[in-house]
């Protein structure tokens, strides 16, 4: 495995140089966190569909256990059990709207992952960098487990476990555990664990920080040891179910799936689950004893257990619902963790927006009223007062607002409108509005994917390194 070791050390050197201003042990992390002998245990998959441009290039890389779709190039990188989902990349002729300027695309957009080490990471959406709209770049970057890189350029960055970078370009940044960023662009910043930051220049700025001591109960991470906490225990207890899925070549749906819905063969769906029209269940999702109403979705790394989704519900990448009832048009953001109990299910009212990286962990009855925004840590009914606001009231804010530890500045209506517009776009893109003829989305376009297996060199100095491959239609 000399070539694989050389590749790892090359990535370490490049990322370490970019993060030299921060006190962070990149070599110690990468040499401990994922042993290289695991890199030869798992095959990789690439998908072919009639709806997505096809071009894959893999050069001097390892792709162990990863799933790729769309136009993807991987160069001098290691991807361990990642989802590289290029089904929302821009196409030639599309127009990027940026600060009043229309930027037409001359070529189909491509995801390029170069000199990077990604671990159990989702890469999705498309580039929002106006300087190079045809390229979604991840370079000199390390991401650890259950990270979401969503429409975000990253150069010279380290992304800690369960962090999300969303519609943001990062340059030389370290993002803390369970932090969420949607801020446009950052240079050489260190984001603390548990910071939730949403900012649109000259419009609004939303910020919340989790109490460090409490957050560690859910997810705690140090570079010299594996992550620990409730999130990890929850995921580890269900890991074997996914192993069974990846051991099967010919798939059959475990439950009835309507013609307008899509269930990935690489999702886990347990009995006593019902799926309605226009439902999307992505790879690495886990559904058990639940009902997904018309237009609901479960994106990558979502877990929905003993829950009911009434319809047109967005469960964004990494969100988890246990003993939860969602009324219509509820949005649950990235990596959120919502847990009720069998005796006291958590009820979320119609039109509620659950901010990304929200934790609602209840041992008592709680109903979130319709039309509210919720965020942060809620463990008892009294917490709702300092972690929620009616969207109607937020829309009236024109200057500053503090609710508990949450700080908001700017135009509340612009914030509410931006979220509602994005949620509507997600539902549309996922095919929730499909009427049998119009408004096709992912639920309809990903029903027929041919998956192909590729594997690395099995022996010798190149053991673990995949052959150089160029696949195109």
Residue locations for each model-derived region?
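Glycine-rich hexapeptide-repeat left-handed beta-helix
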Residues: 5-28, 83-138, 145, 149-154, ...
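Eukaryote-specific, low-hydrophobicity, charge-rich regions
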Residues: 43-44, 53-58, 237-263, 268-270
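Extended low-complexity, polyampholyte segments enriched in Ser/Thr/Pro and acidic residues
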Residues: 1-17, 27-50
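Beta-propeller domains
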Residues: 258-289, 293-295, 299-300
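Short, conserved secondary-structure segments in the cores of folded domains
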Residues: 70, 109, 251-253, 265, ...
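Extracellular beta-rich repeat passengers
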Residues: 41, 46-64, 68-69, 73-78, ...
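Long, low-complexity, intrinsically disordered segments
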Residues: 469-472
